[in-house]
């Protein structure tokens, strides 16, 4: 990326950006009275930083495609990474001077506190309800006078965790496992195993509540077919095509688009499509004609077409979440 590439016409004249390297997509939006300062700033396509927000980093700020940082948020970190389609709603307060990494398709409600005195990792598809707080440090008592409560420790919130409702607290050093559920008003002081529901103060396991049930790829296919039919209804002209393959033709302001469902990517070689749903077989090293969504791996081949973006935004956040197998490659390195 070249130094200081600012081509967006959607940057407010009252916005103030300072960095050694600034690279902003011409499809990003920076609101009024926004202040962003860092060593390096990268703001991607469709990203919105709303009015009155103040972001400062000693290192790098990276905001992926169609991300959001809501109005009047305050962020003070070392490095900030926010991957595609993740959203931080208004009045976010994030401080502490360490690194914060937030993966793809995550949603964090308004008025949350994310403390980064130590590193904070939030995975893909995480949901955190409003007025919740995540703490990587807990100290105030005077050590000179013998206070024994003093902790600074990283926090990890793994993929597809749902911190439900509001007023939840995640304590320093905690790991919340993949697809865990934290009920409203919980104080989490210990690690939460994957696929476990917890609640209360302090939060304890709720064995009677299973956050997820096991599904097969065939189950996913049935659900995705229903989602596609619902998606097609958004357009004034759409129809299901006859033939051996499940396929639909839609007309949008972007043109004509075909959506197909096949068993594997090998079947796509002879087909024309804008969006394809496959049971398996998506490969990182291969190029495809259109956007391909793999139900087994939950990855997709990213083309950044307008119909792909509309489809992803339709699926988010509760229907289905996919991660790009190509495109942005930033990773959490701790």
Q: What feature does the model see in each segment?
A:
Residues 19-24, 29-174, 202, 208-210:
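Flexible, glycine/small-residue-enriched loop-and-beta-strand segment within the central core
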Residues 130, 184, 194:
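Residues that flank catalytic or metal-binding motifs in active/ligand-binding sites
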Residues 158-160, 181-187:
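A generic "structured core" feature
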Residues 198:
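Conserved active-site beta-strand element of glycosyltransferases/polysaccharide synthases
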């Amino acid at each position: 990326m070249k130094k200081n590439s600012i081509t967006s016409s959607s940057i407010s004249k009252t916005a103030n950006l300072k960095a050694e390297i600034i690279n902003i997509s011409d499809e990003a939006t920076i609101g009024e009275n926004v202040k962003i300062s860092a060593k390096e700033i990268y703001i991607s396509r469709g990203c919105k930083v709303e009015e009155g927000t103040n972001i400062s980093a000693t290192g790098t700020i990276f905001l992926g495609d169609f991300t959001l940082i809501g109005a009047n948020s305050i962020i003070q970190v070392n490095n900030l990474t926010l991957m595609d389609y993740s959203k931080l709603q208004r009045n976010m307060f994030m401080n502490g001077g360490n690194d914060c990494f937030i993966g793809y398709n995550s949603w964090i409600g308004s008025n949350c506190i994310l403390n980064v005195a130590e590193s904070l990792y939030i995975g893909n598809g995480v949901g955190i309800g409003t007025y919740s707080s995540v703490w990587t440090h807990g100290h105030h008592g005077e050590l000179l006078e013998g206070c024994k409560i003093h902790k600074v420790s990283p926090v990890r919130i793994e993929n597809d965790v749902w911190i439900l409702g509001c007023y939840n607290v995640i304590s320093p050093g905690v790991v919340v496992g993949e697809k865990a559920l934290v009920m409203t008003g919980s104080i989490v002081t210990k690690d939460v195993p994957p696929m476990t529901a917890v609640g209360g103060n302090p939060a304890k396991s709720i064995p009677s509540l299973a956050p997820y049930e096991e599904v097969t790829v065939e189950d996913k296919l049935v659900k995705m077919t229903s989602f596609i039919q619902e998606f097609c209804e958004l357009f004034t002209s759409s129809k299901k095509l006859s033939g051996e393959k499940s396929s639909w033709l839609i007309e949008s302001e972007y043109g004509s688009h075909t959506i197909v469902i096949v068993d594997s990517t090998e079947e796509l070689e002879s087909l024309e499509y804008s969006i394809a749903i496959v049971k398996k077989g998506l490969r990182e090293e291969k190029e495809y004609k259109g956007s391909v969504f793999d139900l087994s791996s939950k990855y997709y081949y990213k083309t950044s077409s307008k119909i792909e973006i509309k489809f992803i935004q339709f699926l988010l956040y509760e229907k289905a979440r996919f991660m790009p197998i190509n495109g942005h490659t930033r990773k959490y390195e701790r």
